């Protein structure tokens, strides 16, 4: 994947915030179970499928994907090489790489799911990133999105999701609306 200025590297504070035990606890006990519940409610099963973890950071979310969903392949990337080095230390059977979400290193229609654990708000060209996710998704592929409030005007964000070629199957608010979670599917 090419490195570009379209994605923003985390500052020191945010790097530490994303790699702390409280964040991992929230991922494991709140955020990821919510994604699992959404998938189950819509009878979407990703076991044995190809999953992309966009902006994987140190790989904690990637590890949850591997352990809980049991995909056949996981492609995980982050723009920060230091995050990828941390992710590789987890010893997972995952294709970790440094990459840019606005130019994903995957063939068209090659992934059954793309996960966004709070990455889009770091990317000025977030609409282009959504279009890239649609490009790599198979015809009925899904994208799971978790983003914080105040980073987006939600009406504009949902319109961007739809304009990229995704239909919103479900949306949920968390922590009094501070976070929003979306289960979307590539529109046919």
Regions found by a protein language model. Give the residues of each.
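Conserved SAM-binding loop and adjacent beta-strand
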Residues: 20-37, 152-153
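A short SAM/SAH-binding and catalytic strip from SAM-dependent methyltransferases
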Residues: 113-125
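A short glycine-rich, Lys/Arg-flanked "PGG" loop and its adjoining helix->strand segment in the class I
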Residues: 127-139
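Core SAM-dependent methyltransferase catalytic element
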Residues: 174-188
